[in-house]
């Protein structure tokens, strides 16, 4: 989606956003991982900022939370 490299600080902010979005939506980790088609461990790594989702998963996340990919992964101000 974007060519710029994600720094550790960006990854931490993205992880925080993902966790806050899930909590605001009232969804469990199990529900989100099932909706995205990823394992619980992958979701946990996304939320801790240890791993950035592939573009395909970013799109699924954006659809799940009704946000744009840019809002969630590039502005860090979606929540």
Can you name each region flagged by the protein language model?
Residues 16-35, 60:
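Short basic helix-loop element that most often maps to the first helix and adjoining turn
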Residues 35, 46, 75:
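Residues in the recognition helix of alpha-helical DNA-binding motifs
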Residues 38-52:
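Recognition helix of helix-turn-helix/homeodomain-like DNA-binding domains
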